[in-house]
């Protein structure tokens, strides 16, 4: 009893010291939309008006340390100023006396030596929110003031981003000055509604023979790009950017998610050399925008940089009606970064240590990549497979979203055949007679059949030699070797290295050329005449040139 009386007196004393509790916040209407949906719907309008300012003005110095700031929006709490309560690595807890920000709202730390953006991830109760930092938190201290911007992370979009490199929060990192534009969009947006999406299946002609013939890309589809180091992945990506710009007038966006800084720098330099990116007065003629979040960045930045790149691509699709190419390198790092964020937030891990929201995180990104009635976003995603285990949850979840796979083979690159696309391992949902037509489908299957038969005969050739093969098998091998070399192609972006002019091959020409090889029309031509050319007319011309040189 004495203990109970002592506790009661302590509680009463604490209540007197604490004073009257603050008045409860007024309740809104009963049928208020969900916070995330409300935030998505109004973010674009708010961003256009408010996000053009680099940062909202800080609260007056005379205000209280734990509050202050003029609230300009009752729902989002825009303008409210809170206080940092706890910093644990990339996780920062912030308390707001009023103007509590909704989930996914961007906060900006005031009076900091660099611009530090935090994104609200959890509401902890007692006016406390848990946030993920988009940059390093070195130098951040308890009590520092934090501004509620009232909108998600908002980035510049439009033609001003072409030829520029920016980070996850839209800041330029190429030392070429500010990105001057009036167009801004939040990175968190809803996927296009069903009524806005185009259901017609069309192929995106790339001008690359091996891709268009054997594993065609769907307009608005998602393509997985598999390949190790040094097999020509970067050159293939740059040629796709170049060809889409020339043939379709479209732009490209490259999102570097959690990859090496050196590779990002090399890609930028190679794009400048090949003319994909132009500097100085001709910058407006650039064909690609770059968004980087390298592997040295905090997990919050790596988890959101893919969304930043996608937002830039969405503007080109929706506002300008473009066919946009979106490159994501590497989509596995996006999943990996979200797994780190999930662990930092204290969520219980799922299979193989991945976040329990793995499918939701990936689906939120992939479902925004689609074709609408205005334009399309076709995504090429480099995919790292951990320990070459295709059943790992990260790549396995990614495969469910892909429409085509392009596999780059080291064995083919060792033969000097570029692009080193494996014609047997690469697949596409578009390889159907209902989509491509009977001629294209039959030609593609015929090419694959000849190459597969050649692959089956290689062991016999290695042991016994060509002389032991039947006449039919010798003919199969001869045609397969010609097809293998005919799948090579000089690229425009490689002209500066090879000296050979690049070739863009129309789809119809590719189909007719390979059908002629299958029918035996060109059995008399030497196989070296099929190497590094465009259409079949060039093969004939090259064969005549070789014959003249041999005769002389």
Swiss-Prot record:
CDD domains found in the cross-reference section: ATP-synt_F1_beta_C, ATP-synt_F1_beta_N, F1-ATPase_beta_CD
Residue ranges, annotated region (Disordered): 15-35
GO cellular component: mitochondrial inner membrane; proton-transporting ATP synthase complex
Subcellular location: Mitochondrion; Mitochondrion inner membrane
Reactions that this protein is recorded to catalyse: ATP + H2O + 4 H(+)(in) = ADP + phosphate + 5 H(+)(out)
Stored SUPFAM superfamilies: C-terminal domain of alpha and beta subunits of F1 ATP synthase, N-terminal domain of alpha and beta subunits of F1 ATP synthase, P-loop containing nucleoside triphosphate hydrolases
Sequence positions that bind ATP: 227-234
Pfam family, one: ATP-synt_ab_N
Signal peptide: none
Transit peptide: 1-46
Keywords: ATP synthesis, ATP-binding, CF(1), Hydrogen ion transport, Ion transport, Membrane, Mitochondrion, Mitochondrion inner membrane, Nucleotide-binding, Transit peptide, Translocase, Transport
UniProt-listed InterPro entries: AAA+_ATPase (IPR003593), ATP-synt_VA_C (IPR055190), ATP_synt_F1_beta_sf (IPR042079), ATP_synth_F1_beta_su (IPR020971), ATP_synth_F1_bsu (IPR005722), ATPase_a/bsu_AS (IPR020003), ATPase_alpha/beta_chains (IPR050053), ATPase_F1/V1/A1_a/bsu_N (IPR004100)
GO BP terms, alphabetized: proton motive force-driven ATP synthesis; proton motive force-driven mitochondrial ATP synthesis
EC class of the enzyme, as a word: translocase
EC numbers for this chain: 7.1.2.2
Family stated for the protein in its record: Belongs to the ATPase alpha/beta chains family.
Function text: Mitochondrial membrane ATP synthase (F(1)F(0) ATP synthase or Complex V) produces ATP from ADP in the presence of a proton gradient across the membrane which is generated by electron transport complexes of the respiratory chain. F-type ATPases consist of two structural domains, F(1) - containing the extramembraneous catalytic core, and F(0) - containing the membrane proton channel, linked together by a central stalk and a peripheral stalk. During catalysis, ATP synthesis in the catalytic domain of F(1) is coupled via a rotary mechanism of the central stalk subunits to proton translocation.
Assembly behavior: F-type ATPases have 2 components, CF(1) - the catalytic core - and CF(0) - the membrane proton channel. CF(1) has five subunits: alpha(3), beta(3), gamma(1), delta(1), epsilon(1). CF(0) has three main subunits: a, b and c.
PANTHER family to which the protein is assigned, alphabetical: ATP SYNTHASE, ATP SYNTHASE SUBUNIT BETA, MITOCHONDRIAL
Listed name of the protein: ATP synthase subunit beta, mitochondrial
Species name: Oryza sativa subsp. japonica (Rice)
